[in-house]
């Protein structure tokens, strides 16, 4: 009594399950990790990527590389996603997190082959993660964020793995000054918003050494009228987000005019309105008016007569930065302007021509809580890479200021945590001890990769590093990424923020757990009709190829 087979899934569906899926996920993760393995450490190689639009990206930043890569496998997509998460959360460690997650999955493969249930492996990984976090906190050391020399050293160890390391001193100074400028403390809570208030302006030309941090704001705008002043000391600044033009009616407004005088009256009302708006501004005797909207020719005429400089169509984000820098308040209506809305914190308003473009500088502010970083360089590609590196440096500085704890770099903290996990696994009983010990083994991938990227002997140096960590008081020993030899990170001054390390470990282990829990992939395919529909269009190419 054999009936017809019951089809539950559509014929266009493809289903993979069990062991095949798990090994597929692990291989995808390992492939992604292998792509950027050479991008770790001070001897990191750079990758050149061509984006779909034909633009070139040259970088060794893990997140920037993976962002440009097109992948199809769902596990590879989730690996790329964790790199982006790491970048948004702490701004650094994007390469480490991918390598570590790939290795965590790689060491789990042998247990799956031995028919160990994924739940057992996951349980061991969770235990190991808790112990890793506690161990990291134990070996971390507090740091005084007001010690400029030490802060520069910390940022330098982050920059050392980047292309910008040739100008490390300048970059460290820029990153530290920018973060200290935008740091705001309210109700005992520190807020450092680099994205909003530390703007990076890239201007091709000049040399990288010309880059600097402005104590104020720079905007790519010129004054609206040639007769307006282009250099003002101690300016009084008014910021608006309304236009100095006659208000057009809302959509499809109609006015019916029966007499000629009515038309003249309408024109007169427009002029009176603009005159009134300008009088509201002139009443406060400002030197500079900056608006996000337009300024009509008539309004410019009144402002020039009152010796007021005007800048129009400034971005909202730039306007917010100017407000923070000079202490002005952005007004939405001119008739509501008060004396306290005028910004008097800026020391200098100046228009400069750099290359072919005009830039407005509002600098020498008394207590700016916003700044602009001006980057100069030979080409757009170099500037883009320098900006990426600088963003990482600022994020590292921000992490240390908010959470002032450090752990040793150069693979020292990984080896230290791995040693403690290995010792703990000896006291465990049952099957879980093997995946638990495998986590310790996976952590060694960071120092191993550092040694490989130097071209040194991996086995010899890693073995001697393991032996070193069994001794008392050698927790800060790691790999000198420049020379590929053992060194004390404390003496070399290579430190990493605790926040970055914690996030790296958590993200890597949780991603490994997530991918190990997958045992089935169902993928929907395009309908057959769609493929047939496209074939006639492709058909004419066949004869050409035959020729």
Curated annotation (Swiss-Prot):
Principal localisation: cytoplasm
Ligand binding (ATP): 41, 93-95, 410, 481, 496
Binding of Mg(2+), residues: 92
Residues annotated as transmembrane: none
Recorded GO CC terms: chaperonin-containing T-complex
Disulfide bonds: 365-371
Residues binding ADP: 41, 93-96, 161-162, 410, 481-482, 496, 501
Enzyme class: hydrolase
Biased composition regions of type Basic and acidic residues, renumbered to the chain: 525-534
GO molecular function, one term: unfolded protein binding
Compartments, record wording: Cytoplasm
GO biological process: protein folding
Coiled coil: none
Statement: the UniProt record of this protein carries the keyword Metal-binding: yes
Annotated InterPro entries: Chap_CCT_gamma (IPR012719), Chaperone_TCP-1 (IPR017998), Chaperonin_TCP-1_CS (IPR002194), Cpn60/GroEL/TCP-1 (IPR002423), GroEL-like_apical_dom_sf (IPR027409), GROEL-like_equatorial_sf (IPR027413), TCP-1-like_intermed_sf (IPR027410), TCP-1_chaperonin (IPR053374)
Family per similarity comment: Belongs to the TCP-1 chaperonin family.
Name of the featured protein: T-complex protein 1 subunit gamma
Gene behind the chain: cct3
């Amino acid at each position: 009594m054999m009936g017809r087979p019951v089809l539950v899934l559509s014929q266009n569906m493809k289903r993979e399950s069990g062991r095949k899926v798990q090994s597929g996920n692990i291989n995808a993760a390992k492939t992604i990790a292998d792509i950027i393995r050479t991008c770790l450490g001070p001897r990191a190689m750079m990758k050149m990527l061509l984006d779909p639009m034909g633009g070139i990206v040259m970088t060794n930043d893990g997140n920037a590389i993976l962002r440009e890569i097109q992948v199809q496998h769902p596990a590879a997509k989730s690996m790329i996603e964790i790199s982006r998460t790491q970048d948004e959360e702490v701004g650094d460690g994007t390469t480490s997190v991918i390598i570590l997650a790939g290795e965590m999955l790689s060491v789990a493969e042998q247990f799956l082959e031995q028919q160990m249930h994924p739940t057992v492996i996951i349980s061991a990984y969770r235990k190991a993660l808790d112990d890793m976090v506690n161990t990291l906190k134990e070996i971390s050391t507090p740091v005084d964020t007001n010690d400029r020399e030490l802060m520069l050293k910390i940022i330098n160890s982050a920059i050392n793995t980047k292309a910008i390391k040739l100008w490390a001193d300048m970059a460290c100074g820029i990153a530290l000054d920018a973060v200290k400028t935008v740091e705001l403390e309210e109700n005992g809570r520190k807020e450092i918003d680099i994205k909003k208030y530390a703007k990076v302006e890239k201007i091709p030309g000049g040399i990288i050494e010309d880059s600097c941090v402005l104590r104020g704001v720079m905007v790519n705008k010129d004054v609206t009228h040639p007769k307006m002043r282009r250099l003002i000391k101690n300016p009084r600044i008014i910021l608006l987000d309304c236009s100095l033009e006659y208000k057009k009616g809302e959509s499809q407004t109609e006015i019916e005019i029966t007499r000629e005088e009515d038309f003249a009256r309408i024109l007169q009302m427009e002029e009176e309105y603009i005159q009134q708006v300008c009088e509201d501004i002139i009443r406060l005797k400002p030197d500079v008016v900056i608006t996000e909207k337009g300024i009509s020719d008539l309004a410019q005429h009144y402002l020039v007569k009152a010796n007021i400089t005007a800048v129009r169509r400034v971005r909202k984000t730039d306007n917010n930065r100017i407000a923070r820098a000079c202490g002005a308040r952005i007004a939405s209506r001119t008739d509501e302007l008060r004396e306290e809305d005028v910004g008097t914190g800026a020391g200098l308003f100046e228009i400069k021509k750099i290359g072919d473009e005009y830039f407005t500088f509002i600098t020498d502010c008394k207590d700016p809580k916003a700044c602009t970083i001006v980057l100069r360089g030979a080409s757009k590609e170099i500037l883009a890479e320098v900006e990426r590196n600088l963003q990482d440096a600022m994020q590292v500085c921000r992490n240390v200021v908010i959470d002032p704890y450090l752990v040793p770099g150069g693979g020292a903290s990984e080896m230290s945590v791995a040693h403690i996990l290995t010792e703990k696994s000896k006291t465990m009983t049952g099957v879980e001890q093997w995946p638990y010990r495998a986590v310790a083994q996976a952590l060694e991938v960071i120092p191993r990769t550092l040694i490989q990227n130097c071209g040194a002997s991996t086995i010899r140096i890693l073995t001697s590093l393991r032996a070193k960590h069994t001794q008392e008081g050698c927790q800060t020993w790691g790999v000198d990424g420049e020379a590929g030899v053992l060194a004390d990170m404390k003496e070399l001054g290579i430190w990493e923020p605790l926040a970055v390390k914690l996030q790296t470990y958590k993200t890597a282990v949780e991603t490994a757990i997530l991918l190990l829990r997958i045992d089935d992939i169902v993928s929907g395919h395009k309908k057959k009709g769609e493929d047939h529909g496209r074939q006639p269009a492709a058909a004419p190419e066949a004869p050409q190829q035959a020729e």
